[in-house]
Amino acid sequence: MLWRGWAMERILLFFAGYLEGGQPGPEQRDLPICIPVATQLPHAVGLAYAAQYRGDDAVVMAYCGDGATSEGDFHEAMNFAGVWHVPMVFLIQNNQWAISVPLKKQTHSRTIAQKALAYGFPGLQVDGNDLLAVYAATREAVERARRGEGPTLIECVTYRLGVHTTSDDPTKYRSTEEVVEGRDRKSTRLNSSHHTTSRMPSSA
């Protein structure tokens, strides 16, 4: 949000529960933050369709979590995006848990990325802890959309270490061993990504 130009005070207001905090400034090309899960996705497809209709080079990006992919709005948005061939990128943060529901109880699909194939456009899975991998996948998806090749879904696989909300107690539904394993896996990948990035200038 900071990178997109949101003022820090607006972000803090949002997390403090003030309505004003979720409103982007008039100069920003963002929509207000949606609290109901997945409701932003059909709106995003509509914006992408409008951009396509106007003939400009805008690409719409919509973000959601793995839990949102179990909502009807997700599938409706995916269907319209595929049918209309809109310039859009669906970016899914798959952190393995939708509050207290694990991914294996949300879907029988091997990946979330493969769901895109049913709607007629590509889906790919990347390591969500690898900044460079996420950047490369997103850049290619945006360029693809600008070439008129339609939408893309990117599944960023990671792990939620903390609580879902301040009223959440994850110890009631997942083991300490699982959290430790998830933490170690994230640390290893983050360190690997950092070392690769650090070597880039000297190896160029």
Model segments located where?
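Glycine/aspartate-rich loop-and-adjacent alpha/beta segment that forms the canonical ThDP
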Residues: 144-189, 199
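Single conserved hydrophobic/aromatic residue that forms the stacking wall/gate
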Residues: 190-204
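Conserved thiamine diphosphate
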Residues: 52-56, 109-140, 181-189, 199
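Cofactor-binding active-site loop characterized by glycine-rich and histidine/acidic residues
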Residues: 1-84, 102-108, 113, 118-120
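A glycine-rich helix N-cap at a beta->alpha junction
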Residues: 82-92
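Structural motif
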Residues: 59-63, 89-91, 153-155
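Acidic, glycine-rich active-site loops and adjacent beta-strand->loop/helix elements
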Residues: 1, 64-70, 92-98, 129-132, ...
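Short beta-alpha connecting loops at secondary-structure transitions
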Residues: 97-101, 121-127, 171-180
